[in-house]
Amino acid sequence: MQIGKIIKVSGPLVMAENMSEASIQDMCLVGDLGVIGEIIEMRQDVASIQVYEETSGIGPGEPVRSTGEALSVELGPGIISQMFDGIQRPLDTFMEVTQSNFLGRGVQLPALDHEKQWWFEATIEEGTEVSAGDIIGYVDETKIIQHKIMVPNGIKGTVQKIESGSFTIDDPICVIETEQGLKELTMMQKWPVRRGRPIKQKLNPDVPMITGQRVIDTFFPVTKGGAAAVPGPFGAGKTVVQHQIAKWSDVDLVVYVGCGERGNEMTDVVNEFPELIDPNTGESLMERTVLIANTSNMPVAAREASIYTGITIAEYFRDMGYDVAIMADSTSRWAEALREMSGRLEEMPGDEGYPAYLGSRLAEYYERSGRVIALGSDQREGSITAISAVSPSGGDISEPVTQNTLRVVKVFWGLDSSLAQKRHFPSINWIQSYSLYSTEVGRYMDQILQQDWSDMVTEGMRILQEEEQLNEIVRLVGIDSLSDNDRLTLEVAKSIREDYLQQNAFDDVDTFTSREKQFNMLKVILTFGKEARKALSLGAYFNEIMEGTVAVRERISRSKYIPEEELAKISSINEEIKETIQLIVSEGGMTDD
């Protein structure tokens, strides 16, 4: 173990001499307290160390010990339902050890419980040839997630001994004869967080991730293995969008990284998720969630590590063949941590003081998402969907973090403060936002629903865009200058906005909408527009149609509160629309109003 001496302390940056044998990315124990740090720069024998804990009270002359290991996470049974800090220390154990509600310094804790016994069920027999990524057995970690035990990277050989039984994560469960000799496998692996886990092949992401949020699933979908950004000013609803996706998306596992945001938001997750039921499995949402909490009052440097810790845990479960979603809230705070460390290292600043390598660091993170075939002989498919909030100051999306993010993600959900002020949530602006997965998702949904989903989505978006143009005319010369056809367009667009896009995250029914219900709701609104337009062409007046369809339009607006089990009620509105408008045409028609 290399032992150096501190020569300078500057906030989270510590410089130490006599470190010639240490390497970049080595973990260090800094000072007499032994706080955790990581070497980020070497100049001759002087190492610059970013410290993941508070450095007050540490001074020159104190020792620095290099461990010779990179910042790594422990991967094994016991990860799910846990809450970790940015360097994978379990917060509940931390509290028991320190007897404090705040993080103590210099406390070394294992990430996983090394004494708990897990029942291991072997799925292969002795004499089987195995290589990296092959599954040798499993542990039922929660009611939802079967934790598959894989052969670690770099090991290939014949199974000499394996048995089912109750083991800790440190007990040998399997012996493999390799070219280098006998290797004992345990249920735990370690993996450096800054290195992506290897895969066999990357696939095209073309299966939509159903989030239950109508504006996202219909107009701006994200696929399993895709990457999405949610930029928006303060109060626009970024965190609620992230929470909704974490709650209701049809993935197997969610990794939620609270990176530099308010502690109350993580508390909400901890309080809400155990009580909420996953519509896909019928079990508690906490049974499929991993939380990484790095709130705004925690050390800045640990924010930078928390994103990598989260994506490495996500990759581990992806390699088992699971679909994983990782939420980072927010990458702006992570970028601010990069900016602070860069400033203390006296590097040349880029735009707005961010380091010149901001774009490449963001790209490194997002490129670890994707739909893949994992290592192993059974062609397992898994995916990581990366969804990150971006908090541009003042809502200015031309700032560097947002711009560099938009270069690498394919979905942009732009939150609009003016919509939020009107209490239109989710406040995703349908004119600014986009998804480059729309074509693939449209094809997929047409096949699944056996219906013209993509045509309906195109028609709905055309109406919303037409409304934007008509609003310009209305602002200039007033609504009376519009033709009946144009006034009908405004009414249908209003119905799409208020009855379809607007969604109440705190209503038991409206919080989640299945794709079948979304299809039926959108079809009802477009059917009203189509039938009303037909009535106009037959001579009915706009005012006649609006007065005669008050009851049916009321039913359309209430359709979002119809439970999933009663979808036939929504379909029945289509017939009611046709009958009502036919009655208006037969009774009114060319009569003057």
UniProtKB/Swiss-Prot annotation:
Molecular function GO terms recorded: ATP binding; proton-transporting ATP synthase activity, rotational mechanism; proton-transporting ATPase activity, rotational mechanism; sodium-transporting ATPase activity, rotational mechanism
A Pfam family recorded for this sequence: ATP-synt_VA_C
The keyword Ion transport is annotated on this UniProt entry: yes
E.C. designation(s): 7.2.2.1
Residues reported in the UniProt entry to bind ATP: 232-239
Any one cellular-component term (Gene Ontology): proton-transporting ATP synthase complex
Enzyme class (EC, first level): translocase
Catalysis: reaction(s): 4 Na(+)(in) + ATP + H2O = 4 Na(+)(out) + ADP + phosphate + H(+)
Plastid listed as a keyword: no
PANTHER family referenced in this protein's UniProt entry, alphabetically: H(+)-TRANSPORTING TWO-SECTOR ATPASE, V-TYPE PROTON ATPASE CATALYTIC SUBUNIT A
Family recorded in the similarity comment: Belongs to the ATPase alpha/beta chains family.
Name of the protein this chain belongs to: V-type sodium ATPase catalytic subunit A
Gene label: ntpA
